């Protein structure tokens, strides 16, 4: 279920402050964040965010088609190692 339209999109105030500061300074450094729940705004396009996945910060370069999605959608938190293989040599199931 999506967020109500009357509430509008959400982004952490500290994250918006960091993006504004980068826009003013004309430097493109990586913005470190723990806010996976923040919605990507059009003003974020072209910036690289280091989004925390529970272990480390993973860099995410924001492009135009990412607007409206959450930062956490682009950084998986779980590692899938695959299913166990069947034992076909013995013929057992």
Curated annotation (Swiss-Prot):
Highest taxon listed in the record's lineage:
Bacteria
Q: One GO biological process from the UniProt record?
A: ribosomal small subunit assembly
**Keyword entries, A-Z:** Ribonucleoprotein, Ribosomal protein, RNA-binding, rRNA-binding
Q: Name one GO cellular component term.
A: small ribosomal subunit
- Which Pfam families does this one have? Ribosomal_S19
Q: Decide whether keyword rRNA-binding is in the record.
A: yes
Q: Does the keyword Zinc-finger apply?
A: no
Q: Which InterPro entries match?
A: Ribosomal_uS19, Ribosomal_uS19_bac-type, Ribosomal_uS19_CS, Ribosomal_uS19_SF
Which PROSITE patterns does the entry link to? RIBOSOMAL_S19 (PS00323)
A single GO molecular-function term is: structural constituent of ribosome
Which family, according to the similarity comment? Belongs to the universal ribosomal protein uS19 family.
User: What does this protein's UniProt record list under function?
Assistant: Protein S19 forms a complex with S13 that binds strongly to the 16S ribosomal RNA.
Protein name in the entry: Small ribosomal subunit protein uS19
Please give the organism. Limosilactobacillus fermentum (strain NBRC 3956 / LMG 18251)
**This protein's encoding gene:** rpsS
